[in-house]
Amino acid sequence: MLFTGDFETTTDVDDCRVWAWALCEIGNVDNFLYGNSIDSLMELLFNLDSKITVYFHNLKFDGEFILYWLFKNGYTFNSKRKYLNEKEFTTLISDRGVFYTIEICYYKSDTKRKTLKILDSLKILPFSIAEIAKAFSLPISKLEIDYKEKREIGHELTQSEIDYIRSDVTIAALGIEKLFEQNLKKMTTGSNAITEYKKIIGKSKFSKWFPPPVYDDDIRQSYRGGFTYLNPIYKNRDVGEGIVLDVNSLYPSVMYYNKLPYGEGIFFKGKYEHDNVYDLYIQMFSCQFVLKKDKIPTVQLKNNLAFVPTEYITNSGGEYVTMCMTNIDLELFLEHYEVFDINYISGWKFKSSDKLFKEYIDKWNGIKVKATKEKNKPMRTISKLMLNSLYGKFALNPNVQSKYPYLGEDNIVHYRLGPQETREPIYIPVGTFVTSWARYKTITSAQKVFDRFIYADTDSLHLVGTNPPENLDISDTELGCWKIESHFRRARFLRQKSYVEDEYCDIEDIEKYINDNPDLVNHIDLNNNTILKITCAGMPSSCYKYVNWDNFKIGNEFAGKLKISHTTGGIVLLDSPHTLRE
């Protein structure tokens, strides 16, 4: 049987416990169970006469209560996942503290073993519960309760509390059911995507195209994320009217149209020499450099103590810097910087094709277009997940390290690092070239509108002025084209991923916004028909109601943030202000 699960917990560090739990069967949401202690939940699960899997949404939180219960009830942690004995459990927790699974063996005989598997639904539905309800057009929505109300041990749940927790597990169950209907049953969205891709092209073709590279470490040095950059002349400045452009499906579009590597790479020394067959390459080189006038910087140096890893740099400071780039990034680098004393060290070259992912993207983009026309939000949501989750799986890091839980002398669950482990990589060349082409699209587009350019974030451009750029391909629907997403009356950009825009909206959108966000009516300006849209890395949406145009400034604090505190019993969320920092 498959269930979704949820805990409601106290907010007192001296009395941390589960005061309510709920289960909802996936595929049969009328099967709803609830109780008021973690003891009663575990007793129920261990007495169900079938193989049980429970999905908690954000297992990192709920999972710690389960781990504490296991330790206090005589269970022992075993890092060897395949060899669990009775009253042993194992976990899959990354070195960064990301929870994937908890597996518990609660009965074992010579002929039978009973286990309970607990997974994180956030890994397959990367949205909040409220967002899942909207994204899948579910007939129910997330409710509200007073989290801080004092609830004694044995508290009998009120009907409103039952309704609240039932809505949460039901929404998650219905969302997961939609995925299962498409046979998407893996542990993460990336695993679902690559499994589907293998079905489409065939496992033998996959193995031929993407042999696991023994040179993963070399290629991985060229792997970077999306391009996010604030034009310094607009930092901490109020900006007048402008527009926001988004690429229609950036990563799927570069996978569809651009040449990507396949097959075994060939190592070369020195500078790459033109090769009609092996026409994509990774180049290691060293040089000094200075940004050219009126050019956007394209270089970040992640593993060099002389530079801030998140900043795009304008010069090498008179030092020789060693870098590793795809030929796509290298082309941009040489175009945007004056380069001195370049020394080409070595690299890897690859065959290429622009047809590797066409069939996969044709299928899921077709589903997305059809779902959009039919206003089928569940299928549109699933198709977007499948389109955007594939490329990252190719960049899976083979060097991993888990965290192991233990109960400390302070009666609190702690985590220690396990040994370094190695798993087989998939094919990092695809991951690095997909992200490289995506950066190329965004950077070259921003450079074309340099005189208007304010800010870029992966697949978006924010520009001064309201006229559509004539030198960019504009379309509301065409894959890889720029779409005019919004028009703002004014904006303020503090730093990367931290800005507000007074966005023009029609009356219908304003009414819908009020209905969906009753706490945020202070963001609406009916005189100008605008809504204050907030983007702020690290600031939870619970802070937004305290933000306005005047106070969105460096140094200001905002209530509404919850800080995790590990304590006896599990985790307590404590009120903590969010401060806007440089």
Predicted regions and their residues:
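A short beta-strand-to-loop transition that corresponds to the Sensor-1 phosphate-sensing loop
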Residues: F56-L59
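Conserved acidic
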Residues: M1-L2, V13-V54, E64-E582
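Conserved Rossmann-like nucleotide-cofactor binding loop
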Residues: T10
